[in-house]
Amino acid sequence: MLFCLLRFCYNSLMTRILDNELMGDEEFAERTLRPQYLQEYIGQDKVKDQLKIFIKAAKQRDEALDHVLLFGPPGLGKTTMAFVIANELGVNLKQTSGPAIEKAGDLVAVLNDLEPGDVLFIDEIHRLPMAVEEVLYSAMEDFYIDIMIGAGETSRSVHLDLPPFTLIGATTRAGMLSNPLRARFGITGHMEYYTDIDLTEIVERTADIFEMTITHQAALELARRSRGTPRIANRLLKRVRDYAQIMGDGLIDDKITDKALTMLDVDHEGLDYVDQKILKTMIEMYHGGPVGLGTLSVNIAEERETVEDMYEPYLIQKGFIIRTRSGRVATAKAYEHLGYRYTE
């Protein structure tokens, strides 16, 4: 039992339990849990309601759906939504990512493999090289590409017609997309953090699929501490299940859930030691701010991009920090949460 607890704590230190990026051993589980159609997809109602109309209209006209851009923090279901769209359209989905397409030839190979109406899903589309992106413009707009074959005096341009297709791009950093690329997406979907109610339903669905016994109150408590992110909720559920198995009788109730998450340093607002370190640094070293993002990153020994993409969005969404022109500022809520006295 002691070994299990030590291993539990060790894992929580080596890998941040609240990281909203996909971990290596979670890909199979995510595929298992993935809904197939919009009616099975929990949450993101605004995006779903729009897609229902656009998909139905495209099918009635027997046309390819307009290109779709899905943006928002990691772990909110952008990849899942892409698969759902393809299923709703009744077409194949070809999947790749921005970093995997290093040169124009890589993109041409992918495009040349598409059938009429297919969905091409490009994750991390903001990381496409500019040379590749420029080839994509005509492919998206007019369904053709012109490519250069050969080199020097023997080089020649080849025109290649493409079947109508739907490009679905996913990004965590929509601001990094160039204006010409962004303008070619006819449909945009902002994936937002999930409500506690939606996350509770997701937790209960996951528990049912994996034959776990969980009370509704425990599912709600887990949802509240999952940072509005299904990926994190499902990860925490597995760790709470382990705790219930070793330290209890296997039943996941609210008491077991609280003990397990407390052991993992996940507090009642869904903050972990890194989040708290950010807030404490702002309060103790800079009197609450304003403090620049670069300065803050150096003080907590994290990359600037990591703080900006992984930690800051949730802290802002929960009202613990605000952005100003002069830098980040800790709010009264942050002081109160950490037990500091707040003064104007």
Curated annotation (Swiss-Prot):
GO terms for molecular function: ATP binding; ATP hydrolysis activity; four-way junction DNA binding; four-way junction helicase activity. It is found in: Cytoplasm. SUPFAM superfamilies: P-loop containing nucleoside triphosphate hydrolases (SSF52540), Winged helix' DNA-binding domain (SSF46785). GO terms for cellular component: cytoplasm; Holliday junction resolvase complex. It is an enzyme of class 3 (hydrolase). ATP binds at residues 33-34, 75, 78-80, 141-143, 184, 194, 231. Gene3D superfamilies: 1.10.8.60, P-loop containing nucleotide triphosphate hydrolases, Winged helix-like DNA-binding domain superfamily/Winged helix DNA-binding domain. DNA binds at residues 304, 323, 325, 328. HAMAP family: DNA_HJ_migration_RuvB (MF_00016). CDD domains: AAA. This is Holliday junction branch migration complex subunit RuvB. InterPro entries: AAA+_ATPase, AAA_lid_4, DNA_helicase_Holl-junc_RuvB, P-loop_NTPase, RuvB-like_N, RuvB_C, WH-like_DNA-bd_sf, WH_DNA-bd_sf. Keywords: ATP-binding, Cytoplasm, DNA damage, DNA recombination, DNA repair, DNA-binding, Hydrolase, Nucleotide-binding. Mg(2+) binds at residue 79. It comes from Streptococcus mutans serotype c (strain ATCC 700610 / UA159). Its EC number is 3.6.4.-. Residues 268-344 are annotated as: Head domain (RuvB-H). Disulfide bonds: none annotated. The RuvA-RuvB-RuvC complex processes Holliday junction (HJ) DNA during genetic recombination and DNA repair, while the RuvA-RuvB complex plays an important role in the rescue of blocked DNA replication forks via replication fork reversal (RFR). RuvA specifically binds to HJ cruciform DNA, conferring on it an open structure. The RuvB hexamer acts as an ATP-dependent pump, pulling dsDNA into and through the RuvAB complex. RuvB forms 2 homohexamers on either side of HJ DNA bound by 1 or 2 RuvA tetramers; 4 subunits per hexamer contact DNA at a time. SMART domains: AAA (SM00382). Residues 4-194 are annotated as: Large ATPase domain (RuvB-L). Has 3 domains, the large (RuvB-L) and small ATPase (RuvB-S) domains and the C-terminal head (RuvB-H) domain. The head domain binds DNA, while the ATPase domains jointly bind ATP, ADP or are empty depending on the state of the subunit in the translocation cycle. During a single DNA translocation step the structure of each domain remains the same, but their relative positions change. Residues 195-265 are annotated as: Small ATPAse domain (RuvB-S). It catalyses: ATP + H2O = ADP + phosphate + H(+). Belongs to the RuvB family. GO terms for biological process: DNA recombination; DNA repair. Pfam families: AAA_lid_4, RuvB_C, RuvB_N.
